[in-house]
């Protein structure tokens, strides 16, 4: 009996060695034909943690779970008209440029306001802009920019405005069933691999439409077919809620609106989280406003009555004064922002220390430059 078991083990071992050798030969042939890295074991990947770029909003970074938009993935931002979709995308553009990257904006709607983009922190002199004549042209331009590997972020505004060339050449009233959906499906198949390979973030802004004859369930849908829904790693539903009234002389006028951004799909973190932000007209997302709210909830900023304080020092009476104080003291803003990110697990302790060191060096350099400037003036 023992001899029989031993013989079976030897046969199994021999068979296993032959299979392993056959696999190694197959892997060598694949690498020879398609290049190194065409097939690999999952544990051998150098970067197992998903790389992200901040969205430009602390609340949205927290809702996304990973700390921002995942690199090498497709993002869809959709919602009703004037809900803040383009504003959210422009904050991503400003953040990409802030981190030293190159951003491109495919303006299919031909409606981008350069002054508003600049107000949100976008360097319009460095932003690559295209206003294509057709949907195919816009997607082809986006594809060439992504294939170059030099662009960090591409924004397409919007999918609904990517009109197929056949529809443009035809007459109004002609039926073009499924043309846009086929165009988007082909584009997704073509672009997805290149986006992942070059680690480019591709943001597609989309509109809403109503399904005809829906009696039960949500009648809302997005144009462009289903391909984008499948290929997108993150889908954001942006909706404005209540108007923000001004104070003093502006108490009767609206100066912004509270907006909810729901993560309806997320392949890199748990979905269905909601970010509540304030979008101020002409300014974009109030970064100081969201920081005061989140830091107060975490007791990083202490609130006693109407007063807000940090580390025992009062920073303002009322949220507006606290926001103004943080806007005037960017080094304090960065310090509190880092503490919030560490609290939510978006940064490790070591990353916090290095970020604080960089911020300290920048502050010292700024002070030195100011001193030198004073000496030159004298």
Curated annotation (Swiss-Prot):
GO terms for biological process: DNA recombination; DNA repair; SOS response. GO terms for molecular function: ATP binding; ATP hydrolysis activity; ATP-dependent DNA damage sensor activity; damaged DNA binding; single-stranded DNA binding. GO terms for cellular component: cytosol. ATP binds at residues 79-86. SUPFAM superfamilies: P-loop containing nucleoside triphosphate hydrolases, RecA protein, C-terminal domain. CDD domains: RecA. Pfam families: RecA (PF00154), RecA_C (PF21096). The keyword Calcium does not apply. Keywords: ATP-binding, Cytoplasm, DNA damage, DNA recombination, DNA repair, DNA-binding, Nucleotide-binding, SOS response. It is found in: Cytoplasm. InterPro entries: AAA+_ATPase (IPR003593), DNA_recomb/repair_RecA (IPR013765), DNA_recomb/repair_RecA_CS (IPR020584), P-loop_NTPase (IPR027417), RecA-like_C (IPR049261), RecA-like_N (IPR049428), RecA_ATP-bd (IPR020588), RecA_C_sf (IPR023400). Belongs to the RecA family. This is Protein RecA. The gene is recA.
